[in-house]
Structure formats: C-alpha cells, structure tokens
C-alpha cells in the first residue's frame, strides 16, 4: 500500500531514484512529511527544496528539444499534469530518446514524435554537490599546479640555473665572433689564448650547471611522482564496489600503468624546454641587432612549425587513443587468461586462447606501427622546415656578407644564436607529440582519479555495534535501468539471533548482505543497525565490526598468521590460534613445516580450497565481530571440515548476530529463524520444522529436492 501511495506521487519517486543515482539515501516518508504539506504530491518549488535538503543541486530550466543533447543526464522531465518521467539519454543520430516511465516503473524508448507529444519543455537538472566539488578538483594537468607551488623553491633554483645557462649560451657565439673578426684578422695570439681559456671556463660552468639543473629538476619531479602514486593508490582503494564491477581488471590495471607515461614526461625535458623557449626572446633581440632580415626569416619559420603541429596532432591523438584501447584489451585478456589458467588447461582450449591473443596482438602492433609512422612523419616535417630555414639563412647571409652589411663573425654568431632559438622549438615539436600521448594518459588515469569515492551524508562513527538489524521497505536495483533485485523487503533481526537465508539463485540473498555492509545504498527504504541508518554511517567504521566469509575468498601472498590477523597485524598470537581453532584450521596449520609462518602463495595457491576457506573463516572471527555473515561459506568445504565448523557453530555464534546464506539446507536447519526468498521478496520465514509443515511452500520444495 505504501509503495503504491509513493508511486502516485511521481515527483517523490523521481527524487528517490535520482538521489540513489548520486549515492544518497533518503526516507520517502520523511520527505513527504516535510515537503508535501497538502498531501497532493510535491510541487515544483517543494521538489527543489527537498532536493536541496539532500545535498543535491537542482535547477529548473526550459529547454528546446533540439538542445536536449547538451544537458547533463539523467534529468527529470517536469509535467504540469504530474506525469513526470526521467530523461536518461538522447540518441541524436536516430532521433530517439531513452526515458524512464515512473508510473510503469520501466524504461522506454520514444521516437521523435512520441517524445514531442509528451514533452512540455520543462527540465530539472540534478547533480550532487559532492560531484560539483569533484568536477572543480578533477584530475588533469592543473593537478600539478599545487605541486609546483609546494616545491616552488626548488623550481626557483631551476629557473635561476636556467638563466645562467642562457647567459652562457649567449656568450659563446660572441666569443666566436671576436675570434673570426678580430683575432684572425689582426693575428692576435694573446687575445686568442685569453678567449680560449674564457670559453673553456664557460663550457665547464655550462656543463656543471646543466647537470645540476637536471638533478634538481629530477629530484623535485620524483617527489611529485611519489605524491601522485600514493594518491592514486589511496583513491583506487576508496572507490565503491560498483566501479570495479563495471570494469575489467586488465582495463583498470592499464589505466593505473599510465602513470608511467606521465612520470616519464615530467622527469624528461618538458619543463626545461619550456624555460629555454621563454629565454628565446632575449636571443631574438640580439639576433635582431645583428641582422633584422635574417631574424625575420627565423620568425617567419615559427608559424610553419605551429601549423605542422596543428595538422599532425588530431590525427596522432586519435591513433594514440586507438593504441591505448587495444593495449587495454590485451592487458585485460592477459589477466583473464592467467587468472583462468586452470580452466584453460582443464578444457584444453589453449589453441583457441592463443589464436585470440595473436589476433589482438596483431591489432595492437598494427595500431602501434601507425602511431610510429605518423610520429616519424611529424619529426621529418619539422626537420624539413629546419633545413629549409638553414638554406635560406645561408644564402641570404652570404649575400649580406658579400655586400658588406654583415661580417663573417657576425654571420657565424647569428647562426649559433639561431640554433639556440630553433633547438627548443624542435624539442617542443617533439614534446608536443609526447604531450598528446600524455594527454591520453591523463584522461585514462583521470577515469580512476575523477571517479567519486564512496560517498555518504556524514562520517558518523557510531558506538560499538550490538547486533540489532532492520531492513525497512527495501527496494534496490544495481542500475536505474536494471531489473529490481529487492522489492519491498522488511526484515527485523534481533541481537544474538542466528538467521538462515535460503532461496534460488538470483533471489537477492547476497544483495541483502551487500546492503548491510554498505557497498550499496537502497533505492528506497532504510538499513539500520541498532537503530542507526547506515546511509549516515562511516563505511570503514561499519565494516570493521562485521565479519564476512564468502564462497570464494582471497588470501594475500603472506603468511597464514598475517592473513588471519590482516586487520590488526600486531594482535597477540593467542587470538590468532583461538580463531583458527574455531574455524577448524589449527590442526592442518600445525602440520605444516612453517606452521603459522607458512607463506600461502598468490591468492592462497599453496593451499587447498578447503584450507583457504577455513583460514578465511578464522580471519572473519579473529576480531570478534558482533555481526557475522556466512555467504555460502561452507559450500567449498569437505564434510569433515564442515562437521568441525558446525560443531563449533555454537561457540562461533555466541554473543553475535549471525546471517547464514546457503543453498545446502542442512547448514541452516538449526538457525533460530530461516528466511526464504524468491524474486527479491521474502515469501516464507520460520524455523526448520515450521517451514516443512507447509508442503506447498518453496522451502519444502527445496528440501524435497535435496533429499532426492
């Protein structure tokens, strides 16, 4: 009845869905009580106020249909008749609109005519304030500005050294001019000796300062590199589960590896080349003093360098993008193949996998070759411009010398100065190509760093958990356009109660526990522990007090003791052994040569499946959590190991709330209460013998199947 009542107020339904899209939980009844004062549904003004109260930034606009593709979606299409709906995507190529019908609770694809018939020109754009802050602080090249400011003293030292290097670069051509025009003409050997010694001193200082500049600059960029690497890893571990579930492992690894490209660019000659280019204005002034005509030739060549880069860059960027995509595909396929090596060998499908790898590798090599060819063409184009300018300067300079407007020494000095000007330009042309690749790397890495971390409406570290759990009117789906996983689930679990949850695959059993761990926020309703809404709780505080054992558990490449004491490496050995005994793992650990110091290998490869599972159970128990979740935890155990754990179950459950999810009904038959789920709803609940009395019930049906 309550859900139907909410469905009548489509504005409230839309607000609930958009809030969930932005990882914000709300209580519809509370919103209705505060903002729907006349009981007729949310008005436009009250809707905007309600959104603001949820830390959402909402704006009412009027937009023509032809410009809808420019707005941020999803957005709410506001209708004066109350028949609001969500606009999810605009397909401009096919003139189609992906919408979400709030009344029918289903996505719809509308044609141009159908959309025009129901669109009244009013939109409400919605974004979270956290998203706005995130956009302002998004990862791009501006991220390095605070780092430059932080290490401004070091960069100032680099700038000072660069000034001296440019002065030395300016002095050297003057020495050559004096030698050509004065020393050779007047046969001044003493002057020649003085100039030679001075030039040698300048060269020594130039070499020392150049090396010092490279050292100081590399040292500062290495610090920035460490900061970026640390920030990247912290951010990666703070991302929500949904980020990893929607991306391939290899793709994520490939994006993280793009840090190497950025590192190489920064620690190279990028910024030093820019500094050298800035000092070129001084060289131009000296060159103009020597010969305005020759200087104009040099200046006239600069637009050609720029135009050539403008022509090459878009093509190069597209090819680099394609190269990265193929590299990410290869990385993902390689990770998948290594992870599934047992299956590949067991099914003897190595030839098929090799064939797929060969095709993908060939595509990557071809894409990489196209990038190399285009980069080579770009470099050769720059060389062509440089050589052409050199020939023109040689011809024009010779004419000026012959006509007496320029001395030979001045011509040589001018050519040396022009080399000092053109060299940074050529380096920048090469760096511009590198910059295109780094731009791709920044974009790819930004997919990680710009993704919002787990968000919540506060960081409430509540008191120690007692164990009362409440699911109220829970409605949940993993995506707005995905099927409903949980529908109007209401469940009360008392402190210290042992609850078994059974049902067919896909009935929503594991999803309940994910909501309890706050991996996701329900679309509607509340999850409470000891009366506290988990939407307001600090996820780390919550998860430290919940023990979880899954069907497939991952062990780290460390010792058994370190794996069990993962959350508290300094815990006493007695606690580790006690947890291992409860999990039935102590006996087999004692038989190992290194005992608790045995390294388990990557993902626990050095142990059997049952042994890994028992260590995972010990890891969940070692912190004495007040809530314990067993999600098919014993399904991978042999009967003897399962028997040991079931014998210890009374001790395991003592003083804590336990949720047992199982397909094997024998695992849950002694539970205080058994919850039976079907298609996201609770269809039965009671004790084992009570449920068997209903011969037409799902539990009896599953029990009969297992008996047979």
From Swiss-Prot:
Bilayer disposition of the protein:
Multi-pass membrane protein
Q: What class of enzyme is it?
A: translocase
Q: Which GO terms describe its biological process?
A: protein secretion by the type I secretion system; proteolysis
Give EC number(s), comma-separated. 7.4.2.5
Which residue stretches, if any, does this entry annotate as coiled coil? none
One Pfam family, short name: ABC_membrane
Function in brief: Part of the ABC transporter complex LktBD involved in leukotoxin export. Transmembrane domains (TMD) form a pore in the inner membrane and the ATP-binding domain (NBD) is responsible for energy generation.
Into which family does the record put it? Belongs to the ABC transporter superfamily. Protein-1 exporter (TC 3.A.1.109) family.
What is the protein name for this chain?
Leukotoxin translocation ATP-binding protein LktB
From what organism does this protein derive? Bibersteinia trehalosi
User: What phylogenetic lineage does the species belong to?
Assistant: Bacteria, Pseudomonadati, Pseudomonadota, Gammaproteobacteria, Pasteurellales
